[in-house]
Amino acid sequence: MKRIGAKHLEYLTDDFGIWQHTDGNQIDRTQGYALDDAARALLTAVELIRPDLADVYIGFIERSVTVQPTINFYTADRQPWDRPWSPDALAECYWALAVAISNDVQESRCRRIIETSIAPKIYELREWLRASAYLTLGAALIDQPLALELADQLLETYRTNYHTDWPWPEDTLYYANAILPYALLEVGRLHGHVEASQTGERMLKFLNGICLRDREVHLIGNEGWYSRGGLPARYGEQPIEAAYSVLANVSAYAITRNEEYLEAGGRYLNWFWGENSTGESIINLQNESVADGIDAPPRGISQNQGAENIVCYLYAQEQIWPLLKRNS
């Protein structure tokens, strides 16, 4: 496992935003730009201390969310694309802008975007579970009362859906699953919310038990997901699952100092490097890109290298790398 840089991130980024998809290793301009990618890219730019890139992504978010309705996609010629609005994307923008604010990156501009264009929609956004988790992560950094309120809402959803064999707030494990325990863990870590910490840890242990039970890491795939009483999908594994699982385990380690969480986080990072069902790395060291995921044979590792993958990987890498090097 090596530490990669921002070469592919820079390749995908222009003065307008970050291109959403590639065809092989070339930008697929037919797919344009997406708001959620810009939000995740902002997280990464802040973590990498790249104010030049952060400025691009903040600008994209600003032009997308300060109009009605929110623009979730743009075409290659930089025109709004009439595609469905995403509550998750807007909530991810809140999280990313909060991270920028907490790191003194264009603080006044980011606060203005939140106050004028996202804060008025928070009570609408919180009705979606993952959107609520993204909001919780952002609020944990800049709005303690809101963070505690959102955490209590997540906890109530968890309690309502809880089963002894399924300690999870939904009956199915879907997309970006680890963001749910991560949100609770961060509220517990930053604000001393004991129930949030304990429940987040319980949920994370459940998820780790599913994904890390074999010699290689098996993420919940999108070719069927994993519903209670069924079996986890083995294919359609996506980098965002591994990356967010790194973040959740780093947070759990910060709270408990239990080395098992650091080991688990390292294994999720190693999924990118070959601790997966193919035994092969999905990272291209030459251009510092990350493949779109792992599909069923004979397709296997995707040949495409879109934005979501590289921004999620880099953010997770930078969160856990100092801890791994310190313990090596």
Language-model region placement:
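Glycan-recognition and catalytic cores of secretory/periplasmic carbohydrate-active enzymes
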Residues: M1-S328
